[in-house]
């Protein structure tokens, strides 16, 4: 019984080490209305090229919004109407990096932006 508990604990600890997913965003800043900004997200701890990725934002009112998504090979993308034609999501699987090019920025684009797996 005691051995069984130790084994389960060991498996859980090892699983936690193997699942050390890290996503680090960069490129944010203050921009004038109508301006542009490019965000980057460096990924590690998982096989980046195997996953759909997305960008989400948290508004000043704490609401979460999906702003863009891309499939694993970059061949298919999705945008809600609020950003369509202004935002472009892309990825570089060789560099394990996700990008979000934002242009014609509006006041309602003010938010914290996060990449997500």
UniProtKB/Swiss-Prot annotation:
InterPro entries linked to this entry = Ig-like_dom, Ig-like_dom_sf, Ig-like_fold, Ig_V-set, IgHV
* Disulfide bonding pattern of the chain: 41-115
Q: Does the keyword Glycosyltransferase apply?
A: no
PROSITE patterns the UniProt entry points to:
IG_LIKE
Concerning SMART domains, the annotation shows: IGv
Region of interest called Framework-2, as start-end residue ranges on this chain: 55-68
Protein name listed in UniProt? Ig heavy chain V region RF
**Which organism does this sequence originate in?**
Mus musculus (Mouse)
């Amino acid at each position: 019984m005691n051995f069984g508990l130790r084994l389960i604990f060991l498996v859980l600890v090892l699983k936690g080490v193997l699942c050390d997913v890290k996503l680090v965003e960069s490129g944010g800043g203050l921009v004038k209305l109508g301006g542009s900004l490019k965000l980057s997200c460096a990924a590690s701890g998982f096989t980046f090229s195997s996953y759909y990725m997305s960008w989400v934002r948290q508004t000043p009112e704490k609401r979460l919004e999906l702003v863009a998504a891309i499939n694993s090979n970059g061949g298919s993308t999705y945008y809600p109407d609020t950003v369509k034609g202004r935002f472009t999501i892309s990825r570089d699987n060789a560099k394990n990096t996700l990008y979000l090019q934002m242009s014609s920025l509006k006041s309602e684009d003010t938010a914290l932006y996060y990449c997500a797996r």
